[in-house]
Amino acid sequence: MNSTPKQIILIRHGEKPGDPALDSEADGITLSTKGFERAGALAPFLWASFGDPDFLFATQASKHSCRPIQTITPLATALGRNINCDYADEAYAALAARIFGDVQYAGKLVLICWHHGKIPELTNALGGAPPSLKWPPAAFDRVWQLPYPDTAGARTGALPVRNLPRMLLYGDSAA
């Protein structure tokens, strides 16, 4: 049986702390105030743009960051869904193998929140052609959409990936 999702949405975690004088959380592990604002605005954007995600994944918390989990926690709470955070940042190939190897993901919408440095590799592991080789370091307002064809075998080569603006907060890019 084909276990290909309907689509996968990839996002980067919300903003991280920078200047301790400007951020309420300056530990470097959690989201900044703006990051928490972005996390709170995520659910309405996703519902309007893609519908309710059926499955939520985030990078496993580490001593350096819990930002991906924090970014999608308001969404998970609103949907009453769990966040799967079993995979470390470098374990993107194992995550892709799980998604494509388990029929529970077939025809479903999957949201993945990851660290920007590994999103292009994660995209490749998911069969997509990343819009760029690197996720821009200052970009917290983008969505990479991987829409899979309805039938197995309908696609040849890497899947084109749409690089979309989120436009959640003032100053976000519009294109």
Model regions: which residues?
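Short beta-strand segments
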Residues: 113-115
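Mobile, glycine-rich extracellular loop/lid and propeptide segments
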Residues: 110
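Active-site-proximal alpha-helix that buttresses catalytic centers in soluble enzyme cores
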Residues: 2-107, 118-175
